[in-house]
From Swiss-Prot:
GO terms for cellular component: plasma membrane. One of its GO terms (biological process) is osteoclast differentiation. This is CMRF35-like molecule 1. Acts as an inhibitory receptor for myeloid cells and mast cells. Positively regulates the phagocytosis of apoptotic cells (efferocytosis) via phosphatidylserine (PS) recognition; recognizes and binds PS as a ligand which is expressed on the surface of apoptotic cells. Plays an important role in the maintenance of immune homeostasis, by promoting macrophage-mediated efferocytosis and by inhibiting dendritic cell-mediated efferocytosis. Negatively regulates Fc epsilon receptor-dependent mast cell activation and allergic responses via binding to ceramide which acts as a ligand. CDD domains: IgV_pIgR_like. Residues 248-270, 318-337 are annotated as: Disordered. InterPro entries: CD300_family_receptors, Ig-like_dom_sf, Ig-like_fold, Ig_sub, Ig_V-set.
Length: 337
């Protein structure tokens, strides 16, 4: 009878030992400071639709839950820890980023259910960050090369201006013999002493040509202006009109009454007449004087053209030596209506 009770008990013990655990994972994982680590926890197919979580600390029933899924395959992240459930392969993955030395300790992979949750213990180890030596590359020594150039100048006198022809040549490098370099420097100073006088002569010649050109331009402008006498001649063709009033010649006291009576009839008729004289104008407004002689008392007034300068009219024996003066001025132009 005791044996019949012992056999079922042994079968129960064997079944319990061979049964599969609800959740499993790595017992220990390691990471470096300022780095990251990943933990994969497996579960049986019967726990597919349950929530999975990652908690820290001991004992396991009072550990601190860091992150938990929502029974789906969506990624859930909280602070530096994230979790994702792959319900096709029955694996949920936990990732810890920016690791610190204080993150080392005991963690648990767990599944939420009513009562006691199936859990699996994982030990996390954190090592110090690896110091990577910084290598500063050294620059190779810099070697400089000095090149001396010689400029040869040839002056050709086949034209009005000298032609400068320059030849370029390389006499040597700094890496060569020092004696050759000194010869090149001496040739350069020699060519410079020849080149400077040539350039000065060219500049002097250009200055001389410019002065000659300016002198010719001034002379041409003076010729174009012309002498002032031509301008005076151009005014001689103008006509000037002047009003002349004739005065009676002086007579003796005895004959004054006779002449006055004889001229009373003819003098009144011609007193208001106007004398016109064609005069050549002068550039300046000057006063001209004309010597006029009067004929007999019975003669009509005489019209005459007087040119400048006015000459004296010859006198006859019958005429009296009386000279009349008149002021002739050029009239002003009439204003426009």
């Amino acid at each position: 009878m005791h044996l019949s009770l012992l056999v079922p008990f042994l079968f129960w013990i064997t079944g319990c030992c061979t049964a599969e655990d609800p959740v499993t994972g790595p017992e220990e994982v390691s990471g470096q400071e300022q780095g990251s680590l990943t933990v994969q926890c497996r579960y049986t197919s019967g726990w597919k639709d349950y929530k999975k979580y990652w908690c820290q600390g001991v004992p396991q029933r009072s550990c601190k839950t860091l992150v938990e899924t929502d029974a789906s395959e969506q990624l859930v992240k909280k602070n530096r820890v994230s979790i994702r459930d792959n319900q096709r392969d029955f694996i949920f993955t936990v990732t810890m980023e920016d690791l610190r030395m204080s993150d080392a300790g005991i963690y648990w992979c767990g599944i939420t259910k009513g009562g006691l949750d199936p859990m699996f213990k994982v030990t996390v180890n954190i090592g110090p960050a690896i110091q990577v030596p910084i290598t500063v590359p050294t620059m190779p020594p810099i070697t400089s090369t000095t090149t001396i150039f010689t400029v040869t100048t040839t002056v050709k006198e086949t034209s009005m201006f000298p032609t400068l022809t320059s030849y370029y040549s390389d006499n040597g490098h700094g890496g060569g013999d020092s004696g050759g370099g000194e010869d090149g420097v001496g040739d350069g100073f020699l060519d410079l002493s020849v080149l400077l006088p040539v350039i000065s002569a060219v500049l002097l010649l250009l200055l001389l040509v410019a002065s000659l050109f300016a002198w010719r331009m001034v002379r041409r402008q003076k010729k174009a202006a012309g002498p002032p006498s031509e301008q005076a001649q151009s005014l001689e063709g103008d006509l000037c009109y002047a009003d002349l009033s004739l005065k009676q010649p002086r007579t003796s006291p005895g004959s004054s009454w006779k002449k006055g009576s004889s001229m009373s009839s003819s003098g009144k008729d011609h007193q208001e007449e106007v004398e016109y004289v064609t005069m050549a104008p002068f550039p300046r407004e000057e006063v001209s004087y004309a010597a006029l002689t009067l004929a007999g008392l019975g003669q009509e007034p005489t019209y005459g053209n007087t040119g400048c300068p006015i000459t004296h009219v010859p006198r006859t024996g019958l005429e009296e030596e009386t000279t009349e003066y008149s002021s002739i001025r050029r009239p002003l132009p009439a204003a426009m209506p």
